[in-house]
């Protein structure tokens, strides 16, 4: 009886090639597993395709809501952003996908896991660190690090030589990754940073800014302890909430990012990301958080968020440090509750009002009039003490100058 292997299967070019390649080079029965984190219609017909390509079994694991509640909401609460732009769409999904692969492998009695991540990319790190954390004795097979195929054109020829249907056209070979949170695009004209992306051809979730409506749209979000609970007064499941925001955000060209990023392995790459719903959630969360958190907590939370972002991006989700940082973030979110109103207009998100029962904004303190809580004369003593180190330093310099010291 052959040993079993679980393959992270998307039905795209890479994993379509991997099934026959594994059969030719390894003595395993291949179980193709698609983890549904919001790919939509991309999962249609995958079972037939996988079996026809040589898999002995196909499994579809649906986990959209789990993806949002356990992986997306933590990064929303942290407002985790890689290199000032990237909202971790692929980074947050990979640990969950790898976790589900391990679970299926254990159920099926498999002893190995294979993936289609390239030897130059981040995903190989994310997949394999997760497997090592959850199933340290599993064998991991990464065909891109073993075979002599070096391009997408060679992959296409490999399939054509074996009379296997190619799941893409040669003239439309963007490398895309779609989930509930975002859609990424790489390849073609994007490989040269001098080129402007062909947005008319590229975008799938969003309008171009030129094609976005000429009238803006208001959207109101409600948060409880940092987690979105309602949009425009309506309650949604976690996945449906993101889908709804994707729809209205995409309509108004919100969340389109062109990023030159530094991969974990040290290579610079370029990608265009569409994250319409996520961009709205980050903007709304930021508004209410600035209303409800004090300066010291807010500033230190930025430090924690930066480190958390690094852990998530580099595949270190299942680590004690990531859990500890998320626990800190959660502790800061106990008062991040209230309503935020935003206006969406041609790629812009414009704050239009925020309220919270835990607001730290005091109108009488913020106004120019003198109130009971604050006397303008109090500022003199504060400035004297706050500026004392500056004064002492200046006096020292004057004294040194008089003494002829430099």
Curated annotation (Swiss-Prot):
GO terms for biological process: argininosuccinate metabolic process; L-arginine biosynthetic process; urea cycle. One of its GO terms (cellular component) is cytoplasm. L-citrulline binds at residues 86, 91, 122, 126, 175, 184, 261, 273. ATP binds at residues 8-16, 116. Its EC number is 6.3.4.5. Keywords: Amino-acid biosynthesis, Arginine biosynthesis, ATP-binding, Cytoplasm, Ligase, Nucleotide-binding. It is found in: Cytoplasm. It is an enzyme of class 6 (ligase). Its main location: cytoplasm. One of its GO terms (molecular function) is argininosuccinate synthase activity. The keyword DNA damage does not apply. Signal peptide: none annotated. The keyword Ligase applies. InterPro entries: Arginosuc_syn_C, Arginosuc_syn_N, Arginosuc_synth, Arginosuc_synth_CS, Arginosuc_synth_type_1_subfam, AS_cat/multimer_dom_body, Rossmann-like_a/b/a_fold. Pathway: Amino-acid biosynthesis; L-arginine biosynthesis; L-arginine from L-ornithine and carbamoyl phosphate: step 2/3. It comes from the Bacteria. L-aspartate binds at residues 118, 122-123. Belongs to the argininosuccinate synthase family. Type 1 subfamily. Homotetramer. This is Argininosuccinate synthase.
